[in-house]
Amino acid sequence: MSGAPVSTEDRAAEQADLADLLATGERAVFHGPPAQAIGALERAIGLAGQDGRRAEVTAAAWLLGVALAAGGRYGGALTVLSPLLEPGEVSDAAPELRLFASLSAASIASVHRQLGRHAVAREYDARGLHLADTAEAAFDCRLGLAADAVGLGEDEVARAEMEKAGELVAGRDEWWRQLVRLDWVRAEVALLEGDADAAIDAASAAVDRAEGSLAPRHVAKGLLFLGVAQVQAGDEEATTTLRRAATLAESLDTLPLVWPARAVLGALLADDDPAESARSLAAARSAVLGIAGDLPPTVREEWLARPDVAALFEA
């Protein structure tokens, strides 16, 4: 026996509910604690799936993957994002599926990069770039390739890819997220090249733009880069900056930002304030283990064996 047909009014209500769920999820991902996005986006996926709205399912799934990754739930993020690749890679893929396949490849690359797997990340960024038909998607992959090169110590490649990414956002002042991320990578490249002053300038610009965009997670990451640059420059403000980064990251429950901010702060305070140093290092270890808990076994072992991570447990 077939179900009763859905009325026009019910259909409109469902569409409004779906739009609200997507907007709520996107707002939390980029302007609040990312964990607050998860429930709304899971409901959006279910509602869109019931209605056969594949584009909305894909958009919500990508946002869900970003939210999970931002909180350090990398295993969950990869589980959500990986199925979005293949549908966008077929020859007759719809433009929106191709777009989200490219964005998902860049997001998967970011997960691997955060785990220190820069060569793997480069493969996914290249895969995403091959699919990129829009400036937005191409930017994410180009900037990812620059960050991959930083992690691999390839300063010339990093700068070249960064400049290509910069060309894609030239004159697009409304693209706050892309511009903030570009300044992060500018700071990373400057640090790789040993130019702490340039890194401070880039990180400060990222913080200012993120604050103006009401994007606290992006503020926290900008503060992390700023604090590291200040350490390299011998700036006494580094301790204050890193405390701000760590405290904000903890309030957002963004473990990928908590652990490096706490680790650097703990090392910095080892002589001047051993008690705070110990607390900070303990918080870094807790965040590292929180990330490890959501990883597949082989990746977990690799993560915990990473030199800067392993050093936390040897101290």
Predicted features by range, described:
Residues 1-39, 43, 240, 244-315:
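C-terminal non-catalytic interaction modules
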Residues 7-11, 15-18, 22-31, 35-37, ...:
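N-terminal membrane-targeting/anchoring modules of bacterial envelope and secretion proteins
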Residues 10-19, 51-63, 92-107, 133-144, ...:
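Alpha-solenoid helical repeat architecture
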Residues 31, 51, 71, 115, ...:
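Structural motif corresponding to the intra-repeat A-B loop/turn of tetratricopeptide repeats
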Residues 42-49, 78, 82-93, 122, ...:
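Amphipathic alpha-helical segments of tetratricopeptide repeats
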